[in-house]
Amino acid sequence: MNKLLRLIVDNKADKPRPFNLARNGDAASLYIYDVISADWGVSALSVIEAINQAGDVQTLNVHLNSPGGDVFEGRAIMAALAAFRGKTVAHIDSLCASAATSIALACNEIRMAEGAFFMIHNASGFAWGDKTELRNTADVLEKIEGAIVNDYTSRTGKPEQEIRDKMQAETWFTAQEALDYGFVDSI
């Protein structure tokens, strides 16, 4: 089992965690400090409920410290943030890896703390079944990867193959490297 997956499994909660939304005038903050999953950790539904609780705030601060998780939950959170009527600001407080990167990229602005990390890698998953089912799973992973590559190239302006090479290598960016590469706006 790869190290990131082991970290996710070892730190999973028994069920999705509820959010405490912190409001301060025209701004609200939510903290995605866990694995992204419909079954445990942070679910898309819990984030959507928190966004709805924010009401008509002008700025939504999204604090991230997540090893990632379920790509589809991450993309649902991404869509919810993109639909938010105000400004969204991602704050990468420690770790923004895998599916959590989609959440950061959905925000209008991305700030990263000194000492934090941003990790990208190829889509991965589990498969069970005969050879046809395994091949079908690989085909789906390639489609998922294509969507993620598109997100990363749109954000950074880097060529597709360069992004694919970084994902293949499972690249960990420091805050300065993520800034230089175009993933974040400021440190």
Where are these regions (language model features)?
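N-terminal organellar transit peptides
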Residues: M1-T101, C107-I187
